[in-house]
């Protein structure tokens, strides 16, 4: 931001550096109270949520431009819940999560998925799209593809964002951290990921990084992020209502349930869905189309 590197999510270090002060936690709380727009009692969108709880200056510097790039929308068009996921701390903890335990698979997600699909009872077919006729081949289907695509977009296409990646190879260290966000609207990419920092116990002479460019997901693109807009919920509800009436199929994952999910939640819900299915078999009950609230 403005040629400087700041700590995110916003914490005491960020506040002191950005405003050029040396606040204690209590002083920082008082400072932000002065910056916040207290006239916004019930924030109705992302922008109002930001103005109410962090103030205009921090919002403009760290969130406005980044949000426009990431979602292709002005923050006033996004629900307040999008910002509620991001913590603001009045200490020097710059961790995004408050979980008791954090981690990644020891050998990475690629190896984890590889181990799953190599199971003797799992067959993988590439370059083959799912069709409704295939449902008769199975007792039950778990569908993790896009919800609207399952119905051939009969009511219209739901909104998604997709990503383009530009690879950077550096012979040493590139940025000194795993992920760095670029908040300015003038920088076309949203962030750069330097993957070796996710596994600091490894030693690498070179480094591979990727710039991420977010854009609207069009036909033929890979959908990454569901865009849940308040003015588009009628279309989503049409698909959800129809899906809930289905038999012998369960919609799962980020695309199947049309929700923004972190990886830990995705895995936890997959395990939960498996438990629900096994219980339904044991008790001879009907398996629901959704095992989570959508």
Can you describe what each PLM-predicted range is?
Residues 13, 193-294:
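Conserved flavin/dinucleotide-binding core of flavoenzymes
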Residues 82-89, 155, 262-273:
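Surface-exposed flexible segments
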Residues 4, 14-138:
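Active-site/ligand-binding neighborhood in enzyme catalytic cores
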Residues 2-3, 199:
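Short acidic-glycine loop/turn motifs at beta-strand connectors
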Residues 8-10:
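Short capping micro-motif at the N-terminus of alpha-helices
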Residues 128-238, 242:
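Mid-domain catalytic core of redox enzymes
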Residues 104, 141, 249-252:
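Short glycine- and Lys/Arg-enriched binding-loop motifs that mark or flank ligand-binding interfaces
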Residues 124-126, 143, 251:
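A structural signal for the hydrophobic beta-strands that form the central parallel beta-sheet
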């Amino acid at each position: 931001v403005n040629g400087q590197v700041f700590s995110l999510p916003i914490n005491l270090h960020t506040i002191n550096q950005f405003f050029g002060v040396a606040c204690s936690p209590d002083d920082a709380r008082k400072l932000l109270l002065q910056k916040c727009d207290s006239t916004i009692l019930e924030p109705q969108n992302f922008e109002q949520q930001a103005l109410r709880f962090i103030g205009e200056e921090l919002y403009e510097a760290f969130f406005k431009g980044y949000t426009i790039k990431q979602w292709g929308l002005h923050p006033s068009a996004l629900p307040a819940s999008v910002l509620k996921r991001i913590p603001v701390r009045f200490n020097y903890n710059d961790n995004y999560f408050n979980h008791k335990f954090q981690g990644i698979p020891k050998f990475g997600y690629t190896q984890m998925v590889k181990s799953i699909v190599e199971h003797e009872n799992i067959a993988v077919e590439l370059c083959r799209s799912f069709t409704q006729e295939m449902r008769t081949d199975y007792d039950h289907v778990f569908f993790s593809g896009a919800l609207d695509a399952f119905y051939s977009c009969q009511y219209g296409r739901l909104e998604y964002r997709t990503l383009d990646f530009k690879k950077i190879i550096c012979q040493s260290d590139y940025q000194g951290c795993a992920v760095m966000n670029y908040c300015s609207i003038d920088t076309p990419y949203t962030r750069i990921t330097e993957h070796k920092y996710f596994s600091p116990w490894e030693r690498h002479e070179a480094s591979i990084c990727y710039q991420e460019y977010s854009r609207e997901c069009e036909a033929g693109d890979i959908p990454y992020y569901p865009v849940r807009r308040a003015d588009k919920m009628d279309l989503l509800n049409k698909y959800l209502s129809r899906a809930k009436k289905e038999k012998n199929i369960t919609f799962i994952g980020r695309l199947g349930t049309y929700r923004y999910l972190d990886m830990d939640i995705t895995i936890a819900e997959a395990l939960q869905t498996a438990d629900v299915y096994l219980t339904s078999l044991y008790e001879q009950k009907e398996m629901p189309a959704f095992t989570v609230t959508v």
